[in-house]
Structures are given as structure tokens and as C-alpha cells.
From Swiss-Prot:
It catalyses: RNA(n) + a ribonucleoside 5'-triphosphate = RNA(n+1) + diphosphate. GO terms for biological process: DNA-templated transcription. This is DNA-directed RNA polymerase subunit beta. Keywords: DNA-directed RNA polymerase, Nucleotidyltransferase, Transcription, Transferase. The keyword Magnesium does not apply. The gene is rpoB. PROSITE patterns: RNA_POL_BETA (PS01166). It comes from Thermotoga petrophila (strain ATCC BAA-488 / DSM 13995 / JCM 10881 / RKU-1). It holds the Pfam family RNA_pol_Rpb2_7. The keyword Nucleotidyltransferase applies. DNA-dependent RNA polymerase catalyzes the transcription of DNA into RNA using the four ribonucleoside triphosphates as substrates. GO terms for cellular component: DNA-directed RNA polymerase complex. Belongs to the RNA polymerase beta chain family.
Length: 1263
């Protein structure tokens, strides 16, 4: 065990591994991304559309004839006008002005004019990585999407094909497909299959010789079977017997030639066109050429037929016919259509990351291309990389992709398709006997061969024939199988961070504004008379970008329940959203944990509902590279020795490396101790020699998110319970008295530090002044001497603390100093705690003395029995701040007035209002002052419509003036069920906030702080997914008590542990008690937690010292103790596990959920009461509740529930009148839902009529 510093506290850590890498800034990803957008991305977008010509529509014009050109040279970001706190208070957007230097050029004269123009205000990120939009703090969530690139997918196997596709950032997919049935290559254009060679002719490979040369294969000149099998193939080189040429390039390999080659010793291999490429070429001839080779089938060919017979024009027209069969094929239209589809930068964008991925995927194919096609030396070729940089597709991209398909065909064939094994064995035998040994084959014509087999041997599957041929032709080759690309691999996924998301939006909108700028350019006559600012009016763009922050699915109202929920929200990664997956998607693979997520995305933290697996969290050490790929760090291992060199790897880069966990035993010099160690290799776990290890994890916390790494003994918890634990920590309410956990993980300090709510010292210094709202530190230099400026004044840092600020979820944000005057502080030390922090550490809950035992059924179904002591000591008391708002508007009948002069209101309700009618700060307000009277927060009256005034009213008006006017009381009142203290009042008029809203004269906001103590029905939880509801609050003298008389504070159900498999809570309970007894604070890092014997033995010794060991076994300590019943003093039958567990109070507070409905709103169609507190709704009586009432025979109750209490409109009105007049309630009528049913049936053309018991027709509309 070692001591570690956590904030201003020291913990005893059970961690044994050395961590060479400090935990990075956990909000850095958000900050860096948005800073890059403002500094570079904005200019990138503007330059992408520069220059804008006034005559841009005519591409054939010379530059000098293009009129005027506008281009953007640079951008500048101004300073924020209003600070974040003022923006939140006034409901403004925290933003900065952006300027661009634009240059206008007269293309004819060359004259230029440069000017800095104002583009508008754009939201600015706060220091904590958030945005303030219209006064609300928001976060833009990172989005994970499939990266643009080239993918060879197993999905094609379902269609019995091999294929890959180019996935662009913008534009159509281009597929490359190999159909193994007819051995032909196809290009998939716009969803239609076209012969690949036809397509290659349209993109630069005009001659057939050029195309066929791209697809060579080599035959072993000594392999008789292989040579004879490929009779009919096209030669790609001259063949010599000594000095005598016996065959030319482009000749056909005949049977005689093959036999002759076998007898020549000097020839090692011959180069031919790959059979599939030859087949594709012949298919192309059949498609386009009208003439054929009828009658020549039996004659052996010696020369290639139809070379260059298909022209480029033929290719264009044939493709256009395929793609647009409804249009008349024209060569210009065909060229334009194909060019726009894949080669026009305005329509097709592979993006930089897409180009990088394509280059990476084609690297090996390019090396083979250089060796086989270009004839380069293999050693030299392997040094080269495929370094294309075009953002549209290039012909060679498509060629290399199609060549890769041959590898899939040759190496995977038998495995990928279901072939009858008996039939296959039989075929191989026949093939060897009948064709190879008797030399019957004349050419590699798959179609003929298949038809012969079908006719002669009754073969049912074409694939069996092809598999047999493939088996024979590769009988001596050991070819490893090639894996397919998977979309779920993180090497094929990238993260769009906030900067990129905003930049994409900006780019999309600027494309629209470009036309407006162009139109204004056409109106210019001379440079001297024009202002560039008048040309550029892109305020609509800026306002729409602002709308992105307010409305986009990825811009979310920040989860601000506690510092952890805020930190997690900023590190969230979503697969849903624009351009991502849909929440309704049934693709389970996309939700599953993938091995490539190790160290990049947390395998634990994800929501439980429809978003499970789609929304995840970044792991602690994750970084995002310039392309958006997730990287994780590893320590380099050389010859079995672990070095301190840290390397960041992408998911696809680590595939072939052997990586061992951080817990692998090493000696003091870093040498791995065991000779064989467990290592990860791709998705496998293997036992490998230590010399073969390449990397080691940097930390045991590496795979997990911040939230998951805060769970002690995580390794002892089932994954689904750990998921609940990490999610529920984010719902913990900051308590009045924060207390850090006795048993932590060491991450509490890191989480609090990165949340932005713990104030850190910016420089070394000595604390000069401290009060509740500010801290002043006198700086010191590196020698500890106080610093003064040139005038002899002390150099000080002043820190302003947040006091009683309302969070997005109505919890309280409050900072308090944790240093005293005269304290020395170092740079980075915590000097003030925020909400839910204690001495710089995250403190979401309280350490509670718990006992695991049943108690009178009060802990049935995970319910929790708590002691009155927790209420008396304010252990789970929290403060919630709610804001109430009202506006005084200009109405048709005159202005509304905020006043204390409210008609027909008692003095009791007005006593806390000031002379302006606004509640005074510090007043304690209760929602109910007697029956039906709610506390008034803001007095407001609205003019009433006045009819003809009587003479008496005229006299009153003349005497009392406006006060005699008829007004309606529209005061802002405190809602039912709320009480608290007014802590702040904000009053704004149009002088304070320019955009107050049309017709709004004054805005008043009243902040009320409520104290919420623990109550029955409140939800409590531990950190291990162990959650429950308070069932009863017992006097502390009735609670079970320890041998020394200490009553336990909480009783939990022991049945909640075995089936849930979250044993971590038991270990935490034991270690928590040890911490309490010894006064130490422990840290048990993830996967390095304390072992049982490290806890139970010292715990027994400490308990024995204090006489608390009764019920435990000295030889085999179990941590149990004999408890006595507080009511009787009798001991319970069995010893009980007792200890300190860290418990959280969750934001689901019962008092906030309970409400009562009198008469409220009804839904429009069904006329049934709405549901939920926000709609003042009723309790739903569902189908099963109806069964229950039926089972009891409660006919009258049931009739009442289904009619007058629900949707019998006439009946409920009559019942209301009857109650008011103290009369009997009338008989119920017809429910509205019955009428809706009748209407629906009539809508289906069914004539529904109703009859009474006498057979008389009933008119339902009368009831």
C-alpha cells in the first residue's frame, strides 16, 4: 500500500502498478475542437468558396471576362461582449463577433480593394467546454459515424457475390463487385450493375490492352494441371524457346502451346490475363458487339478476338442506357452524368479522412500492382506508399479495389458459400479423372464447364463446380483467409467533434449564401462606389448556425445535476443524430461492445433504454487524432522490458500487436517476470512468450470512462449492475454537507478537478484574504518570496466564487473556500470546493452505517429502512433552486402593471411584497396560506375589457383615478407543494435586455431555494447498481444496534446481492468500516482493489480493540457482527454484515412527483384526462386495473371510473353541478371513447347501429 495525494486529502491506495501517464484534461477534446474551428475551420469554409465570380456560371469564360471576384483572405475573432454569468441571468447567448478580411478584384483591370467585414456573432465556448444559448447552458455531443473510405463487406456474401464500396463524405456510392457464378467484374453505379471494363473505358483506360494488362496472373510453367486448366487464356508476354519466339503477347494459350511450354526448361512461369478479367472482357464484347463467334466453339482459338472493338462512345452509351433507361442515350449527357456522379468536386467529396482511409486500404494492392503490372523491383515497390491526394475518385482507386476482389475469391471461396460437401468431393474426383487426366478442357470457360457438369453428372449447384476448380487450381497453395471489413470496428469509425459539426453546418449554409453574393456582384459597376460589407450579408447564415446550437439533436441541454453528470455529458459519444443511426434501428451489432473499443470507448457506461449501445462515453485516456479516429496510449515493450515510452495507437493499428494488461508483473527494472503472459491480439486472448510482447496498457483504468472508474471493486460487480452504478452516480443530488467516500478509487480528485467547479490556484502564493465569496492570493516566485510589481504593490490573484447559482436541473451550485488566511498554496492546488465536492474530491453522497438484514418486511423488493438520525443530522438534505418568471406585456386594452395594489387579496399575502409588488429577498414563502391561497411572488394586474360604465363607476373613477379601473389579478404565485426562501430577484426592462420580446415591458424572475430532507419514497443508491426506495423512517432508538450501542443508520435487503452479482458493495462495506475505525481514507483503483484478506484480517483486529468482534471468527474473519433489536434489546438470530457504504440520494425525489388532480385538462380526441404532473393529469386506470375491479365485482366504482371520472363529457359536467348543489350524482352516460370507436368503424365503411333491449334503435348523439 502507498499514500497518494487526492486534492487536499491523502489516501492509502491498494494500487500496485506505476502509471507513467498523468490523466489528461478530460474536457480538452471539446475545447481543442471548437478552438480549431474558430481559428482555422471558419477560414477553410470561406476559402473553399473563394473566389466568387460575378460571371461564375460560364466556365468557358477567360478569367479577365469574369467581371468581379470576391475572395476571403483571413478571419478574426473578437472578444465576448457579455460575461457568461450575465448571459445566464439575462437569457442571452454567450457569443463573439467574427470578422473576415475580404478582397474584391476587378478581373479586367486587376484593381483590388480589401476591407474587413463584420460577419455576425457566433456562440463562444466557456472555459468549462459549454455554450450558453438564450441563457441556458448547453453541450454539443460528439458524434461517431462510419468513416468515409473503401470497405469490402461480408454483406455481399448474402447476395452470393464478393464486393466492396467507396463510401464518400458526400455523393453516390461506387461499388466494385465480383460475381463468382459467371466470373465477371461489375461496377455498381447508382445501385445498378455495369460491366467494370465498360466503366474503366469511360474514366481513362480507352484501349482494351491497357485494361487487360491491369489484371495479370502467373502460371507455374512446370505445373501441368495448372497450365492445361488455363488453356484459352490470353498471354501477357512473348514466349521464347531459346532465341525462338513461339508465342506473342495477346496470343491465346492453346493446348499444344501448353504442352510445348512443359518441355522447355528455361521457362519458370508465364504471365496471362487473369481468367476473371478475361471473362469480363468477353462479356463486355457480348454486351456491346452485335457480331459473335457462332460456330467457332469447337475450334481451338490461337488469337485474341475483338480487341478494341468496343469504343469509349459505346461504353458511355451502354452505361447510360443501364442507368437511365427512360432517357434517350446521348453522348454528352452520358459524359456529364458520369462525371457528376463520381468526379465532380461539387457533387462528390471523399474528404481528407476518406482519402486517407482509401489510400491505407489500397496500400498493399498498390505494391502488388507495381510489381505485377509496372514490373518494379519488389524491394523498391515495398518502400512506396499509395499517396493519392485527390478528394474525388481516381481510375487507379477503382482498379486496385477490383484487384483486391480476386484475393477474396481465391482465398475465401469454399468457406463463404454453403456447398454440399459430398457433391464437392465427388466433383473433385470427376474433375481430376475426366478433365485433368484425360485433358478434355479446351479453355477456362466456366459457363461451358458448368453446363457439361449439369448435363453429364447431375450437379445441382454451379458453386460446387467453381469450388472444385478453385480447389484443384490452388491444391498446392497455402493461402490464408482474408477478413472482411466490419462497420463496427473502431478503425472504420470516426468521431465528429463539436468544431467539425459546426463547420459542416456553416459550410452547408454558406453554399446557399454564395448565390446571393454572386447576384450582388453582378450589379457592381466600379470598385470605388461599392462597400464590400454591402455584398456580404450572411446574417441569415449566422442566425441558422445559432439555430444549430439551439435546435440540433446533438446540441443538448446540459445535464447539470452534479459535477460528474456535467463532465460525462461533455465526454459523451452518440451514434444517433443527423447522418448517424436511427434510434429505432434493429442492428444489434451496432449496439454491442466491440473489442476495438478497448481503451477508447467505455464498455460499461451507456443508457438502459432505446439508446443502449448507441450512446457511450469516452474512456479516460482517449485522444482524437486529426482525422477523428480514437486513439489510446500504450507503453512500448522491447525484448520483454517495459519502457516509459508511450505510443498512441488507432484501433486498426493495434490489430497485429501483442498487448498485455497493466497488471502484468514486472520487476523494479521493468522486466516482465513470467516467461509466458496473457496478451490481447486483435479479438483473441493468447498466452505468448514475454519476448514477443509489443505493448502494455498504461493503466488499469484505461478501458473505462470517468464514471465507471469511480466504482470501487468494479471487478467484483456484474457488468449490467456496474452500468446502473455509473449511470446513477450522474443522478446524485449535491448534498448540503458533502462528504467524500471512505472507500474511493483515486479518481475522485481527477473528476472534481476537471469538472470546473473546484477552484484551482493559478500560481504559487500565500492566501491573503478569504471570505465566502472570494479568495485573494498573494503570488510568490519559485523561491517562495512574495512578488511585487514596479510600483511596490503586491501581485495578487483574486478568485470570485459562485454563490447559490441555479443549475439546469434546479440543483444548487455553490462554492466555499477550503483554505485559510496565511496558507501557502501551490499552482494547481484546490482552494475552493464546488457542489458535491469535499476537500477537492468528488463527494456525491455520504458514508452510511448499513446492516444487511431483513426488518419486518420494510426492505422487501429493495426498499430501504432508514434511521431518523439521518434527518436530524441533515445527512441527505439537499437544496434545490427553482426560478419563477412573469412578464408585464402591452395588451390590447392597455399595459399590464406590476404592483402591490392587487384587488381582493388579504394583507397576509401582501406582507412580503415591496412597494413595486415584488417579493423581497430573504422572505420565506409557503405555497398554501390557508385554503386556496398561494403565496404571491410578483403582484401583477391586467386590464379587463370594460363595457358601458354606470354613473357610480364614473364617480369612483373620477375620485380614485386609475386605481378605480377594473383589472384582473394575474399575479405570479408559488405553485402548490413548494416552499422555500427567496434568494434572488431579477427585474429587467427593455433598457437591460434589447431582445426582450415583442410587447414585453418588464421581466421579473424570482429564485426560490427549497430545502429537501429525506422522505419516504425518495430513491437512494450505492455505486454498484444497488438502488432502492425509502420505505420507512424509524426512530434511531428502534434501529438495530452494535455491541457498543451504536445504532445502524440504514437497513438493506441481503437478497439484493446474490442474484445481482454485485459483490463489490460487500467489500466496500467491510473496507468502509475499517476506514472509519482507523481514520484512514482508502483508494482501491479499478482491477487493483483490495483483496479479502487485506480487508477482513485488519478489520477483525480493529474491531477486537473496541469490543466489536462479537459474531466474527478469529481464524476465518467474515466481517459479521451480532446486532440487537433496538425495540427489545434482544440479539438477532444470526450475525449480520455491518459497515460503512457510500450512499447517494438521487434526483428522483418523491415529493416532486406527487400531485393531486381536481378538474383539469382533457385530451382533444378521447376526452380523457391527461397524464403527468406537468399537465395536471390524472391517474390512469388501465386494462389490468379494470380486471382487478371486475374481479371484486365493484360495478358502481367501475362505472364511475370509466365514465364521469374519465370521458363521459355530459355526465362529468352534470356530476360537477350535483356536487356543488349537494344533490345526488346522476346516472353515467356514454363514454367518448365509445363514440370514437363507432366513428372509426364507420370510417372503415361499416354501418354500426345501436339497439336497446326492446329492439329500438338508439341515436348515440343524444346521449
Amino acid at each position: 500500500m502507498k499514500e497518494i495525494s487526492c486534492g487536499r486529502r491523502t489516501r492509502v491506495s491498494f494500487g500496485k502498478t506505476q502509471e507513467p501517464l498523468p490523466i489528461p484534461d478530460l474536457v480538452e477534446i471539446q475545447k481543442i475542437s471548437y478552438r480549431r474551428f474558430l481559428e482555422e475551420g471558419l477560414l477553410e469554409v470561406l476559402k473553399k468558396f473563394s473566389p466568387i465570380y460575378s460571371q461564375a456560371t460560364r466556365s468557358d469564360l477567360k478569367k479577365s471576362d469574369r467581371g468581379f471576384a470576391l475572395e476571403f483572405v483571413s478571419t478574426r475573432i473578437g472578444e465576448p461582449v457579455v460575461d457568461p454569468l450575465e448571459c445566464k441571468a439575462k437569457g442571452l447567448t454567450y457569443s463573439v463577433p467574427i470578422y473576415a478580411t475580404a478582397r474584391l478584384t476587378d478581373m479586367k483591370s486587376g484593381e483590388m480593394k480589401e476591407e474587413e467585414v463584420f460577419l455576425g456573432y457566433i456562440p463562444y465556448m466557456t472555459d468549462r467546454g459549454t455554450f450558453i444559448i438564450n441563457g441556458a447552458e448547453r453541450v454539443v455531443v460528439n458524434q461517431i459515424v462510419v468513416s468515409p473510405g473503401l470497405y469490402f463487406s461480408s454483406e455481399y456474401i448474402d447476395r452470393e457475390e464478393y464486393g466492396g464500396y467507396f463510401l464518400p463524405s458526400r455523393g453516390a456510392w461506387l461499388e466494385v463487385i465480383l460475381d463468382p457464378y459467371d466470373g465477371v467484374l461489375y461496377a455498381g453505379l447508382d445501385g445498378k450493375k455495369v460491366n467494370l471494363f465498360l466503366f474503366l473505358k469511360t474514366i481513362g483506360y480507352e484501349k482494351d490492352e491497357d485494361i487487360l494488362s491491369l489484371y495479370p496472373t502467373y502460371l507455374d510453367a512446370d505445373d501441368e494441371d495448372s497450365l492445361l486448366l488455363h488453356v484459352g487464356s490470353i498471354l501477357l508476354e512473348d514466349i521464347y524457346d531459346g532465341d525462338r519466339k513461339i508465342a506473342e503477347k495477346w496470343d491465346i494459350l492453346t493446348k499444344d502451346l501448353a504442352e510445348r511450354i512443359l518441355m522447355i526448361d528455361d521457362i519458370n512461369q508465364i504471365k496471362i490475363v487473369h481468367p476473371i478479367a478475361q471473362n469480363t472482357f468477353e462479356k463486355m464484347l457480348e454486351l456491346v458487339s452485335s457480331s459473335g463467334e457462332e460456330g467457332e466453339e469447337e475450334e481451338e482459338k490461337t488469337k485474341i478476338y475483338g480487341l478494341n472493338e468496343v469504343t469509349v462512345v459505346d461504353a458511355y452509351l451502354e452505361i447510360f442506357r443501364r442507368l437511365r433507361p427512360e432517357e434517350l442515350p446521348r453522348i454528352n449527357a452520358a459524359k456529364r452524368y458520369l462525371h457528376d456522379l463520381f468526379f465532380n468536386p461539387e457533387r462528390y467529396d471523399l474528404s481528407e479522412v476518406g482519402r486517407y482511409k482509401v489510400n491505407e486500404r489500397l496500400r498493399n494492392a498498390y505494391i502488388r500492382y507495381l510489381i505485377e503490372v509496372e514490373g518494379e523491383d519488389p524491394e523498391e515497390a515495398r518502400k512506396k506508399v499509395y499517396n493519392e491526394n485527390s478528394l474525388v475518385l481516381k481510375p487507379l482507386d477503382i482498379v486496385l479495389a477490383s484487384r483486391i476482389l480476386f484475393d477474396y475469391f481465391e482465398r475465401r471461396y469454399v468457406n463463404d458459400f454453403e456447398i454440399d460437401s459430398y457433391e464437392l468431393r465427388n466433383l473433385i474426383r470427376i474433375f481430376k479423372e475426366e478433365y485433368l487426366e484425360k485433358r478434355k478442357t479446351a479453355s477456362y470457360d466456366l459457363r461451358k464447364l458448368v453446363s457439361v457438369f449439369r448435363r453429364n453428372y447431375g450437379v445441382t449447384s454451379d458453386l460446387s463446380v467453381l469450388a472444385a476448380i478453385r480447389y484443384i487450381s490452388n491444391i498446392n497453395k497455402e493461402l490464408p483467409s482474408i477478413p472482411f471489413d466490419t462497420k463496427d470496428h473502431l478503425g472504420n469509425k470516426r468521431v465528429r467533434t463539436v468544431g467539425e459539426l459546426v463547420q459542416r453546418e456553416f459550410e452547408r449554409l454558406f453554399a446557399r449564401a454564395q448565390k446571393a453574393i454572386q447576384e450582388r456582384l453582378t450589379l457592381i459597376n466600379s470598385l470605388s462606389k461599392v462597400s464590400i460589407q454591402s455584398l456580404i450579408n450572411i446574417k441569415s447564415i449566422i442566425s441558422t448556425v445559432n439555430q444549430f446550437f439551439a435546435m440540433n439533436q446533438l446540441s443538448q441541454f446540459m445535464d447539470q445535476v452534479n459535477p460528474l453528470s456535467e463532465l460525462t455529458h461533455k465526454r459523451r459519444v452518440s451514434a444517433v443524430g443527423p447522418g448517424g443511426l436511427r434510434r429505432e434501428s434493429k442492428v444489434f451489432e451496432a449496439r454491442n461492445v466491440h473489442y476495438s473499443q478497448y481503451g477508447r470507448l467505455c464498455p460499461i457506461e451507456t443508457p438502459e433504454g432505446a439508446n443502449i449501445g448507441f450512446i457511450t462515453s469516452l474512456a479516460i485516456y482517449t485522444k482524437i487524432d486529426e482525422y477523428g479516429f480514437l486513439m489510446t496510449p500504450y507503453r512500448k515493450v522491447v525484448n520483454g522490458k517495459v519502457t516509459d515510452e508511450v505510443v498512441y495507437l488507432r484501433a486498426n493499428e493495434e490489430e497485429d500487436f501483442k498487448i498485455v494488461p497493466a497488471t502484468t508483473p514486472v520487476d523494479e527494472e521493468g522486466n516482465i517476470i513470467p516467461e509466458r503472459v496473457v496478451a490481447r491480439v486483435g479479438e483473441d486472448i493468447r498466452l505468448v512468450p514475454r519476448e514477443e510482447v509489443d505493448f502494455m496498457d498504461v493503466s488499469t483504468k484505461q478501458p473505462f470512462s470517468v464514471s465507471a472508474s469511480l466504482i470501487p471493486f468494479l471487478e467484483h460487480d456484474d457488468a449490467s449492475r456496474a452500468l446502473m452504478g455509473s449511470n446513477m452516480q450522474r443522478q446524485a443530488v449535491p448534498l448540503l454537507k458533502a462528504e467524500a467516500p471512505f472507500v474511493g478509487t483515486g479518481m475522485e480528485w481527477e473528476a472534481a478537478k476537471n469538472s470546473g467547479y473546484v477552484t484551482l490556484a493559478e500560481h504559487d502564493g500565500i492566501v491573503k484574504e478569504v471570505d465566502a465569496a472570494r479568495i485573494v492570493v498573494h503570488r510568490t516566485d519559485e523561491n517562495g518570496n512574495l512578488m511585487y510589481d514596479d510600483k511596490g504593490n503586491p501581485v495578487v490573484d483574486e478568485y470570485r466564487l459562485l454563490k447559490f447559482v441555479r443549475s439546469n436541473q434546479d440543483t444548487m451550485i455553490n462554492q466555499k473556500p477550503i483554505v485559510n488566511e496565511g496558507d501557502f498554496v501551490k499552482k494547481g492546488d484546490p482552494i475552493a470546493d464546488g457542489p458535491a465536492t469535499d476537500m477537492g474530491e468528488l463527494a456525491l453522497g455520504r458514508n452510511i452505517l448499513v446492516a444487511f438484514m431483513p426488518w419486518e418486511g420494510y426492505n422487501y423488493e429493495d426498499a430501504i429502512l432508514v434511521s431518523q438520525e439521518l434527518l436530524e443530522e441533515d445527512v441527505f438534505t439537499s437544496i434545490h433552486i427553482e426560478v419563477y418568471e412573469t412578464q408585464a406585456r402591452e395588451t390590447r386594452l392597455g399595459p399590464e402593471e406590476i404592483t402591490a395594489d392587487i384587488p381582493n387579496v388579504s394583507k397576509e399575502l401582501l406582507k412580503n411584497l415591496d412597494e413595486n409588488g415584488i417579493i423581497r429577498v430573504g422572505a420565506y414563502v409557503v405555497s398554501d396560506y390557508g385554503v386556496g391561497s398561494q403565496a404571491i411572488l410578483v403582484g401583477k394586474v391586467t386590464p379587463k375589457g370594460e363595457g358601458d360604465t354606470t354613473p357610480e363607476e364614473k364617480i369612483i373613477r373620477s375620485v380614485f383615478g386609475e386605481r378605480g379601473r377594473d383589472v384582473k389579478d394575474t399575479s405570479l404565485r408559488l405553485p402548490h407543494g413548494v416552499e422555500g426562501r427567496v434568494i434572488r430577484v431579477d427585474v429587467y426592462d427593455q433598457n437591460d435586455i434589447a431582445e426582450l420580446g415583442a410587447g414585453v415591458l418588464k421581466l421579473v424572475r424570482v429564485y426560490v431555494a427549497s430545502r429537501k430532507t429525506l422522505d419516504i419514497g425518495d430513491k437512494l443508491a450505492g455505486r454498484h447498481g444497488n438502488k432502492g426506495v425509502v420505505s420507512n423512517i424509524l426512530p434511531k432508538e428502534d434501529m438495530p444496534f452494535l455491541p457498543d450501542g451504536t445504532p445502524v443508520q440504514m437497513v438493506l435487503n441481503p437478497l439484493g446481492i446474490p442474484s445481482r452479482m454485485n459483490v463489490g458493495q460487500i467489500l466496500e462495506t467491510h473496507l468502509g468500516w475499517l476506514a472509519k475505525l482507523t481514520g484512514k481514507w482508502f483508494a482501491t483503483p479499478v482491477f487493483e482493489g483490495a483483496k479479502e484478506d487485506e480487508i477482513l484480517r485488519p478489520l477483525y483486529e480493529e474491531r477486537k480493540k473496541r469490543g466489536l468482534h462479537l459474531g466474527d471468527d478469529e481464524n476465518n474473519p467474515n466481517g459479521k457482527v451480532v446486532l440487537r433489536d433496538g425495540r427489545t434489546g434482544e440479539p438477532f438470530d444470526n450475525p449480520v454484515v455491518v459497515g460503512y457504504m457510500y450512499m447517494l440520494k438521487l434526483v428522483h425525489i418523491a415529493k416532486e412527483k406527487i400531485h393531486a388532480r381536481s378538474t383539469g385538462p382533457y385530451s382533444l380526441i378521447h376526452q380523457q384526462p391527461l397524464g403527468g404532473k406537468s399537465h395536471f393529469g390524472g391517474q390512469r386506470l388501465g386494462e389490468m386495473e379494470v380486471w382487478a375491479l371486475e374481479a371484486y365485482g365493484a360495478a358502481h366504482t367501475l362505472a364511475e371510473m370509466l365514465t364521469i371520472k374519465s370521458d363521459d363529457i355530459k355526465g362529468r359536467n352534470e356530476a360537477y353541478k350535483a356536487i356543488l348543489k349537494n344533490m345526488n350524482i346522476p346516472e353515467p352516460g356514454v363514454p367518448e371513447s365509445f363514440r370514437v370507436l363507432i366513428k372509426e368503424l364507420r370510417g372503415l365503411a361499416l354501418d354500426v347501429r345501436l339497439y336497446d333491449e326492446n329492439g329500438n334503435e338508439i341515436d348515440i348523439d343524444k346521449y
